[in-house]
Amino acid sequence: MILAASFLIGDSEGFSPSIYTDKTGHPTIGYGYNVSVYSYESKRITKPQAYELLTDILKENHKALLSYGWYKNLDAMRRMVILDLSYNLGLSGLFKFKQFIKAIENKNYALAVERLQKSPYSNQVRKRASRNMEILKLGVAKNIVRKNTR
């Protein structure tokens, strides 16, 4: 689960060995690692270090999300989307999507997609959001191309 989600996120985020400012104005490094939220001492990072940071956050988020029945009852592909959202938005950001979560809880994936589509998230990361909405709706992704993330 964590490995597959990390590939999706690595593909979406891309890799940067040095700190840059993302689309929302946050200082970021590695695979979209927000240094204003999580501490990181250096101004440079290697791919293995960045991958470790990414997977550590995913493991932590996955563990926290398993306490919610709506997440625990999802199939693996849809769980990956939720993990991607939790990485991109943070857990607190994800939990603000109350109507989206309610639709997921009710297994109304078309409505969940609609809720996500109407959110600022969808405009900020269009390609990524489009892929995530496809997976939510169908339970599969048609066009996932894995780039080398290590």
Model feature map: region roles:
Residues 1-21, 33-37, 45-56, 62-63, ...:
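Long, amphipathic alpha-helical surface segments
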Residues 60-97:
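Active-site nucleophile-His-acid catalytic modules used for acyl/amide transfer and hydrolysis
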